[in-house]
């Protein structure tokens, strides 16, 4: 079960990475509908596949571009006269948003992101079945409870993904989508810990728990602020502001995110420093958290001083997610130590 949980966690990290690449490349609307892509199960690769062609056959739900508008076929039809068919209601303009652009790169980047998201459902269902069987067998239901929570968040994030597309990447919904993905990872950490806790506990210093809890809250807040900064960068990019001018063009509140990183660093160190001489598995956790924290600060400095390099954006996000998970994992051990 632990191996399957780790697989699910690794796949979720891949989805977070893919989602960050989608944002980095501006591919969020590469597929204008959900769950299909231009009404197709396999996305188009050429513009001719999404433009009206006389004499072509189209299935119901097929989406085409014409006159800078996205049109949806209302029935299966052999199309011969677009205007006549539009007048009779066989083609209807898509009304959930007005985004009508086809970019094959964006389409496939978004499709791969969705495909990875769908594949995460496989280990989620396997975990649900496995933990239920284990609960019946050994009367230990905590892993099953975590598996249910995990599946709930997975379904909710999938639904939010649809809402994000339908709303043409409504800004705050993207942040909520990211927090949902974070909740999926936290539920997996809880599941893994519920299996792990019967095989030994980690000795922790009681005085570090308070600082760790504060560090977790501040790091999540930084993650939310960072997502909002990223959305502002997207707006600047769409407005064709030069990359070198992005920092200067950001709203003043982004400095809260920039300066807040040093507060997060200080608070994280408050629980890490007393454990610097830890042994065993705790030593590994402390080293991992320290490495994630250092790399997170480094990529933040790169953003400010080197014009927000595109490659650093997904790395920065993954490091933040990893740091949050490390905090959650240690807090779970603190809780187990109390019970």
Across the structure, where does each feature detected by a protein language model lie?
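Polytopic transmembrane helical bundles with strong interfacial aromatic enrichment
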Residues: 1-339
């Amino acid at each position: 079960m632990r191996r399957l949980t780790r697989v699910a966690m690794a796949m979720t990290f891949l989805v977070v990475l893919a989602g960050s690449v989608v944002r980095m490349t501006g591919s969020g609307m590469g597929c204008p509908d959900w769950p299909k892509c231009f009404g197709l199960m396999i996305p188009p690769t050429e513009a001719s596949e999404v433009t009206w062609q006389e004499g072509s056959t189209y299935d119901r739900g097929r989406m085409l571009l014409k006159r800078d508008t996205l049109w949806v076929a209302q029935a299966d039809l052999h199309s011969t006269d677009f205007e006549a068919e539009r007048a009779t209601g066989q083609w209807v303009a898509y009304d959930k948003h007005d985004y009508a652009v086809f970019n094959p790169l964006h389409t496939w980047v978004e499709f791969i992101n969705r495909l990875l998201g769908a594949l995460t459902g496989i280990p989620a269902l396997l975990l649900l079945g496995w933990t239920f069987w284990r609960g019946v067998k050994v009367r230990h239901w905590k892993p099953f409870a975590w598996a249910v929570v995990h599946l709930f968040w997975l379904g909710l994030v999938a639904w939010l993904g649809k809402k994000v597309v339908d709303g043409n990447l409504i800004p705050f919904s993207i942040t909520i989508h990211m927090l949902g993905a974070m909740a999926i990872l936290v539920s997996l950490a809880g599941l893994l810990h519920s299996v792990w806790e019967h095989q030994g506990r980690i000795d922790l210093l009681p005085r570090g728990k308070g600082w760790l809890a504060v560090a977790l809250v501040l790091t999540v807040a930084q993650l939310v602020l960072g997502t909002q900064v990223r959305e502002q960068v997207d707006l600047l990019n769409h407005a064709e502001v030069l990359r070198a001018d992005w920092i200067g063009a950001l709203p003043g509140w982004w400095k809260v995110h920039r300066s807040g990183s040093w507060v997060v660093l200080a608070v994280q160190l408050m629980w890490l420093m007393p454990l610097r001489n830890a042994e065993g598995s705790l030593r590994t956790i402390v080293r991992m958290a320290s490495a994630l924290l250092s790399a997170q600060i480094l990529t933040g400095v790169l953003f400010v001083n080197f014009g927000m390099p595109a490659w650093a954006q997904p790395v920065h996000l993954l490091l933040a997610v990893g740091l949050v998970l490390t905090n959650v994992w240690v807090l779970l051990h603190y809780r187990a130590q109390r019970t």
